[in-house]
A protein has these predicted regions:
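GHKL/Histidine-kinase-like ATPase module
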Residues: 185, 192-194, 200, 204-285
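Generic signature of intrinsically disordered, low-complexity segments enriched in small/polar residues
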Residues: 7, 18, 28, 64, ...
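Active-site-proximal structural scaffolding
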Residues: 84, 117, 161, 180-187, ...
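A short, contiguous, amphipathic alpha-helix enriched in charged residues
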Residues: 34-43, 84-103, 188, 221-233, ...
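A short, sequence-level motif marking secondary-structure junctions
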Residues: 83-84, 146-151, 183, 216-224
Length: 285
């Protein structure tokens, strides 16, 4: 094109870029992208449990196509991130901000996490017409509200010192996403998988009509293997071990049955790595 000039070079605001090209951040604009939004926020709460804080996560379906995710972990620290901007606001509204950087140097607030790029929650915020985040700790509840990634308000309430955790609520924006109705079945499947990967962590799903369902695993991957093999037609007793050294942990469950096909599932920091050829090859050897 002969008319390609300097004025053709544009610069988009961070949240404007996410809204214009959501696929780069959440994978797609369809049901899979919406499910990924839920996974991003759920993973933040799971990371609290993996770092020794909290033992329950509540997922509630709300009216007007909303969903909330609440944990009883440590809560995001109170304080001022920059003049006029709280730490809570920054975690969901300031690019490249978070508490999971530098895990390997000891300067992070987390020893392990499913993500550490400071993007997930902000991407969900950007594609939401309404986004609310709350942190509860040290006798104080902070609440921030956004719309389409833009900060709307901040307020504080005094609470009991024993209450801790993080709460996030979002309503997907139909102007950005092609699908804004949550797939309850898909979310339950995702939560069930997480319950096997995080033994000892209880998940409670509350539907809009008030009915609830709990997901909890005491034996982790051992329970998962039995779930995947409901007939329990094992040729020999399954092998299971869970070992830790320093900040590293390895959990393995292996069982053989009389079927002709195999099921292999591999995870790293709760992220499904089954499609990795290198992992699969080393596993089979």
């Amino acid at each position: 094109m002969n008319n390609y000039q300097a004025n053709n070079i544009k610069s988009l605001d961070y949240f404007e870029h996410i809204r214009k090209y959501p696929g780069m951040y959440i994978g797609s604009k369809d049901a899979k992208g919406l499910l990924h939004c839920c996974k991003e926020l759920l993973s933040n709460s799971i990371d609290e449990f993996l770092n020794g804080a909290g033992n329950q996560i509540n997922i509630r379906f709300l009216s007007n196509n909303g969903i909330s995710i609440e944990d009883n972990g440590r809560g995001i620290p109170h304080g001022e991130h920059s003049p006029g901007c709280s730490t809570l606001q920054a975690c969901y509204g300031v690019p490249n901000t978070g508490g999971k950087f530098d895990n390997d140097t000891g300067e992070s607030g987390y020893n392990t996490s499913g993500g550490e790029h400071g993007t997930g929650g902000k991407a969900v915020n950007a594609v939401s017409k309404k986004f609310i985040a709350k942190t509860r700790r040290d006798g104080l509840e902070e609440i921030v509200e956004f719309s389409c990634g833009k900060f709307i308000s901040h307020k504080e309430n005094k609470i009991d010192n024993s209450i801790t955790g993080t709460y996030v609520e979002f309503y997907p924006d139909e102007e950005v996403l092609e699908e804004t109705n949550f797939d309850v079945k898909a979310i339950k499947t995702m939560v069930r998988e997480f319950s096997f990967l995080c033994k000892g962590l209880k998940f409670v799903i509350i539907e809009e009509n008030g009915t609830s369902e709990e997901y909890y695993s005491k034996n982790g991957l051992s329970d998962y293997m039995e779930y995947l093999n409901p007939k329990k037609d094992f040729i020999a007793p399954p092998v299971y071990f869970d070992v830790s050294e320093g900040k590293y942990q390895l959990e393995v469950a292996i069982g053989y049955n009389n079927s002709y096909s195999s099921t292999v599932k591999l995870y790293t920091n709760n992220i499904n790595a089954t499609s990795s050829i290198m992992y699969k090859t080393s596993k089979r050897k």
